[in-house]
Regions:
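Non-catalytic, solvent-exposed segments at the cell envelope interface
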Residues: 1-395
């Protein structure tokens, strides 16, 4: 669920708006839309020094504020329904966006997010950390990955729908029809443009696809991310100041960010950097995983995941196994759409015994002086992936 493709859309288009029609009043209004929250709950001293590369945690939150039953009943909780760790290389050639399965088990660090909550630490699922505030999610992701997080961006369900509607809808191509009454989702096969509500349902549906697990929908979320990147950076948006402003007004109203991204000028500076990355240099991939010992409904990071994170930490390109990045499927066939909107905390998620779901092609490393690296033993990494320039209707 998009949730997360917000990196290429929010940041790039913020730069376009500010540089193109950047009146002071416009900047002040858009900056005033943004909600801020601390980046971290603890001291900075135990974190690696910042380098020329950047790591941004994207959070799609399922705070239960929506009235529609199809998106889950309100229960006052707040969890990250989607998490993406986006790595921007120092050379400006690559963005590697790693999806982190929300049902990943790990030892969550103790956390006290001022104004949000505190947690004493312990074994738990990655997505539960957000219930104590974004800083606790940042701490949990750093614990899982060993990668420094420089910024975070959070968008909730209502914000996501507003963003898609402000874009004028999200063009997608579904190889197969989708019918999921639990998510109020009934979509035909083929090319179509989805409004915000259907795009969210598509991004969340579990029961209409695959084995009904949370893992099954990650490839579908890659499809939605790619579609958002393509639509938000299209001439239909960028060449129309009115549409661009509507999009950015909706987007900034939906954002919770750390103080380092709290102003349009901050987003514009980062957006200028993001806008120079070619679409073929943006790769979405799923964290390699395996079934958690003793709990097939949960997953843990695999040895290949450790290799992925090592490369992010030292800003090295990642070599992915297989043919070409693009279809985002678990078995090499094209994906059809995302998982559902029911309150799916993992009750019936059935993780496969080996979780690196699909083979994908080499991540683009154009312009990088480094040689793409694979796993710790030198083999290319096998996981689900697609490039941002994927033709969603191809094949």
């Amino acid at each position: 669920m998009l949730r997360p493709a917000r990196i290429a859309t929010v940041l790039t288009l913020a730069a376009v708006l500010v540089l193109g029609i950047g009146a002071v009043g416009t900047m002040r209004h858009l900056s005033g839309n943004i909600t801020t929250s601390p980046l971290r709950a603890g001291a900075e001293s135990n974190r690696d020094a910042a380098g020329g590369d950047l790591n941004i945690l994207l959070l799609g939150s399922d705070s239960r504020d929506l009235a529609e039953e199809s998106f889950g009943e309100a229960d006052g909780s707040r969890r990250s329904d989607a998490m993406v760790l986006a790595h921007l290389s120092a050379d400006g050639a690559r963005i590697d966006a790693v999806q982190l399965p929300r049902d990943t088990l790990l030892t969550l660090p103790a956390c006290d997010d001022t104004g949000e909550g505190s947690f004493s630490g312990g074994r738990g699922m990655l997505n539960s950390a957000l219930n104590y505030g974004p800083a606790c999610s940042v701490a949990a992701v750093e614990e899982l990955t060993g990668v420094r997080v420089d910024h975070f961006v959070e968008v909730d369900f209502e914000g996501f729908m507003a963003i898609i509607d402000a874009l004028g809808g999200l063009p997608v191509c579904l190889p197969d029809a989708l019918d999921d009454p639990a998510a109020d989702l009934d979509l035909p096969a083929g090319q179509q443009t989805l409004g915000g509500k259907d795009a969210l349902a598509l991004a969340r549906t579990r029961h209409a696809v695959g084995d009904g697990s949370d893992i099954a929908r990650l490839g579908h979320q890659q499809m939605v991310m790619s579609a958002v990147v393509q639509e938000a950076t299209s001439r239909q948006v960028i060449a129309r100041p009115d549409r661009l402003y509507s999009f950015l007004d909706a987007t900034t109203s939906a954002l919770t960010v750390d103080p380092g991204l709290s102003g349009i000028a901050d987003l514009a500076a980062l957006g200028s950097r993001v806008s120079r990355v070619p679409a073929e240099g943006i790769t979405f991939l799923t964290m390699p995983w395996e079934a958690a010992p003793g709990d097939p409904n949960r997953v843990v990071a695999s040895a290949e995941a450790a290799a992925v994170f090592e490369h992010l930490a030292v800003d090295e390109p990642i070599a992915l196994a297989g043919g070409s990045v693009g279809d985002g499927s678990r078995d090499g066939s094209a994906d059809d759409g995302l998982d559902d909107g029911a309150d799916d905390r993992g009750d019936d998620q059935r993780a496969d015994e080996k979780g690196s779901a699909a083979t994908a092609g080499p991540a683009s490393s154009a312009g990088s002086p480094a040689t793409p690296q694979g796993s710790s033993d030198g083999a290319p990494i096998t996981t689900e992936a697609r490039s941002a320039d994927t033709d969603l209707c191809a094949g």
